[in-house]
Amino acid sequence: MTPTHNFAFCVATSISFSCLLTAAELPKHIAHEAMWQDRGNISALNLTYGQGGEQHQPSGPFTFVKEDSSGTSPKFEIVDQQGTRWKAKVGEEARAETAAAHLLWAAGYFTDEDYYVAELTVANLPKLARGNQMVTAGGVVHGVRLERHMSGQEKGGTWTWARNPLQGTKEFAGLRVMMALMNNWDLKTINNVIYKTGKEKGLTYAVSDLGATFGKTGNPLVRSKSNLKDYQSTKFIQHVRQEDVDFHLNSRPFFLTVFDLPNYITRTRMQGVVKHVSRAHAGWLGGLLGGLSHEQIRDCFRSAGYSDVEVEGFAVAVEGRIAELTKL
């Protein structure tokens, strides 16, 4: 086998109404190993608040705890007067991640309790190593996604798209489709978390970082996050066959960047996450999401701080993708 063929082989294998239900009113039973939970009547869900519901929305005052240097987005931890800890994220991922978490929750998947706050005052806030441009006098931080630390929940490691206990189920296939629907181009294993929840420590599988969504997928020179124009310009379904379907998700770098072989292989494998998805399973998700109203979908983006024009644009684009799924 020639070096070129050998390399190719390596790569190849490699909403808001008072009658709406909040998260606290939903069934609490979780199977021992799960990534999806039946939300009941999806048309009655309140997508303004997502997983945490209205009762868990943040309320100050807040005090700085420490800065978090992980990942690419500026983050820091704060605590409210009730002692609840929150992780604050600022930058271009803040709005996209909030909207994505609320939409994913509505589809039945486990997510973090994410809220978007346009302006947040934090006591004892020092000069930040990252994101200090989002801070003004008096410790006022602008454009913040707050992730609530959930009591009784522990992280139990990570899971991979290639190997996990939910493979082959319609729920796992649906999650793969959701990643394509939201244009999530950052499907690294480190973003997939296993949570131990409740007294019996049942395991729930979740995608914990959804910031690289609602933009354009592609190589580092063209991909984007939280960009309406880019999101509207991309296609959703790539190929439809008798039994399965491929979705668009471009993540692989230029071939000329192959000197970073591990990254090249990792990004190539990410594209495979949304390929060869069962048509029946993708159609199941489409039927589920088809129960959402235009106003519910708008609430996903309104709750994330987008402008009226952006809210309408994103909602229409998402509805278009749902319509494509229902035709499978």
Predicted regions and their residues:
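Regulatory N- and C-terminal appendages and interdomain linkers associated
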Residues: 8-15, 19-66, 80, 289-328
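Conserved ATP-binding subdomain of kinase catalytic cores across diverse folds
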Residues: 49-161
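Extracytoplasmic/periplasmic, Sec-exported soluble proteins
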Residues: 70, 92-96, 166-173, 184-185, ...
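Sec/Tat-exported extracytoplasmic proteins
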Residues: 80-82, 107-108, 179-185, 322-326
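Conserved kinase catalytic-core segment
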Residues: 96-97, 102, 154-234
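Residue-level detector of family-conserved "landmark" positions at structurally sensitive sites
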Residues: 114-115, 192, 311
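C-terminal catalytic region of ATP-dependent kinase domains
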Residues: 199-328
